[in-house]
Amino acid sequence: MSEQTSMSIYLSNEKTKKYLQSILGERTNQFITSLTSLASSSNYLKNCDRNSLLACALKAASMYLPFDPNLGFAWAVPYKNTATFQIGCKEYIQLALRTGRYKALNSRDVREGEFVGRDFVGDPIIEWILDDVRPEKPVIGYMAGMELTNGFRKIIFWSIQEIEDHALKYSQSFRKYKQTGKSSETLWASQFDKMARKTLMKSLISKFGIMSTDMQDAIKSDHSSLKIDFDTGDESIEYPDNSTNLEKLSEMEESKNES
């Protein structure tokens, strides 16, 4: 049985389709077509548990965001045959802008010579160098900055070491990769730049920004494995790439306590 047929049959199950219609309404058929196509065309998702992949796609749909890794908003990454929900830096920016409370929002790398110190409240002072010289300089860290419509501004900066320490603390796969040097399932190994930008943006918004319900849901769901009970409509959530789910909860609590 082909992957497309398998997913198509799974989604056309009466109980599954009824649940989808209760959530998506008139968007149901388009959703089924898109997810079936994704499952058939993606080699890295072909062995993923169907329920977890569906739950990831539904999470993106609930936020009205495209579920496609090529667009950089929301997608799924396999972890031991389970689809884990991934959110890009673009999604955090998109959800923030929807609140109407953000005037500017950005995250980028910081090159050697650009970080010159901190001001009297501890915010980083960054002096950007010329674009034609910049690519020649090594990346020493990442920053994220925002300005709200009420005039509040905040910038945060993490060094490369601080970002790696964060990844090592919360990702089993990245720890294994650093220990063995072998290929890993974690995006921290294959897409460090994107993960660093997203991590800084996520930290900035969760600690200092204004968060809508969708933004809170996005932060909670990022890197999670989701499961749906079609009988009750309940959604369960786990964080398989953390050593324990308690570590993920600890990370979320740290964001609250530091805000």
Where are these regions (language model features)?
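Binding-interface segments
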Residues: 3-211
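Glycine- and charge-rich intrinsically disordered segments
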Residues: 1-18, 215-259
